[in-house]
C-alpha cells in the first residue's frame, strides 16, 4: 500500500520543520542515549555500518559496507535508516526519523542540527576521537544555475520522471550526492566524506528524505500502472543479501531478515511510513501532470557514464562552441573515498543542458565540446580525464499529452 494521508506516531517520519517542541526534545533524548550506548545498537556501531572502520571485503581488501553506484543503493540506505530508527525507538523515540526536504529552497540547515547547546544532533564523535563538522558551500544555498526553481527540485524532478527503475536510480543517487558534498564542504570529518558521513546526525535527516523520494517515485509508478515494488533490471544484484544487514551478528531482526534489495521495495515490511507523500504540495496525480508537461518541450541532455574515482568530488562542466566561447553548463557531485566499494554505473546520468545550448546558439549537430573540472572535497584539482566527456541526446517534445 502506498501511503498518502497525514499520520503521526511511532514509525512515522515527519518533515523536520513540522516537529513540535516535545517531539524535538524526545528525539534528542533518544539520540543522547544511543550515543551513550557502547553496544551493538549504539552510535559507534551503527555509524560504522556505512564507512569507517570498514566492515566488508572486496577482492581481499577491506572496504566500507555502504553501497553506492549500484542499483541496490536505495534499498541499502532504506535498511540503514531503519536500523537507526529502530535503535532510536528502543531508546524512547516516539516518532520516526524526520526528513529534511532539501528540494525546497532554503538558506540555512534545519534547526534540529544547528542549535549548539545540549544538542546531540549538532555533531557526532568518531571512534578515533574526531568531531564531525560542516563547511557548507555557497551553492548549497544559492542555485548554481540561477533557475526559477531550486537546483535540487529540478534535479529530483528529472529523477522522478524516469519510468525505468535503473534509470531512476542513477538520477536519484547523483542528486543525493550533492547534499553530502555541499553540506560537508572541505570538512575532513563530515558529510562529504564516505568514511565519516554517517557520524554526522544530519545524515539521518538527509537519508530519511532520500528514502521518501524513493517512496514518492514508487507511488508515481503505481499511479502510472508500472512496476513499483520490483524492477526489470539488475535482477541478480537485487537478489543478493546486503551486508552488514545480512550478518548473523546484526542485532536488528527486521533488517537482518529483509537484507535483500528485492525484499524492501515494499517498505510496509519495515513498519514505517511518511506523514505524507506530497511533493511541493502536489499530490501524486498532480505531480505526474507536472512531469508530463515537462516533456512537451524539446530538451537536450548531456549524458555521463559515471564510475568511482576513489574520492568525493565536485564536478562542473562547461559547454564550448567552435570558437572556444564557453558557458557554465552544470554541476554534480561524486561520493567516494579510499574505502569505497568499486562501482560503475551501466546507465547514463542525464543532465539538462537545453538552456546553455540555446545561450550559445548551438544545436545538437553543431560543433562544440565540453570542458570538465573535477575538484576533490579537500580542494585538490583532479585529472579531468577521470570522467569521460558526455554524449549528447536530443529528446523531441511531446505536444499532444493534453490534446483530446
Curated annotation (Swiss-Prot):
Decamers of large identical subunits (450 kDa), each containing 8 globular oxygen-binding functional units. It holds the Pfam family Tyrosinase. Cu cation A binds at residues 50, 61, 77. The keyword Aminoacyl-tRNA synthetase does not apply. Its cofactor is Cu(2+). It comes from Helix pomatia. PANTHER family: SHKT DOMAIN-CONTAINING PROTEIN, TYROSINASE FAMILY MEMBER. Glycans are attached at residues 38, 60, 378. Hemocyanins are copper-containing oxygen carriers occurring freely dissolved in the hemolymph of many mollusks and arthropods. There is a cross-link at residues 66-68 (2'-(S-cysteinyl)-histidine (Cys-His)). This is Hemocyanin, beta-C chain unit G. The lineage of its organism: Eukaryota, Metazoa, Spiralia, Lophotrochozoa, Mollusca. Disulfide bonds join 56-65, 166-233, 320-326. InterPro entries: Di-copper_centre_dom_sf, Haemocyanin_beta-sandwich, Haemocyanin_C_sf, Tyrosinase/Hemocyanin, Tyrosinase_Cu-bd. Cu cation B binds at residues 176, 180, 207. Binds 2 copper ions per heterodimer. Keywords: Copper, Disulfide bond, Glycoprotein, Metal-binding, Oxygen transport, Repeat, Thioether bond, Transport. GO terms for molecular function: metal ion binding; oxidoreductase activity; oxygen carrier activity. Belongs to the tyrosinase family. Hemocyanin subfamily.
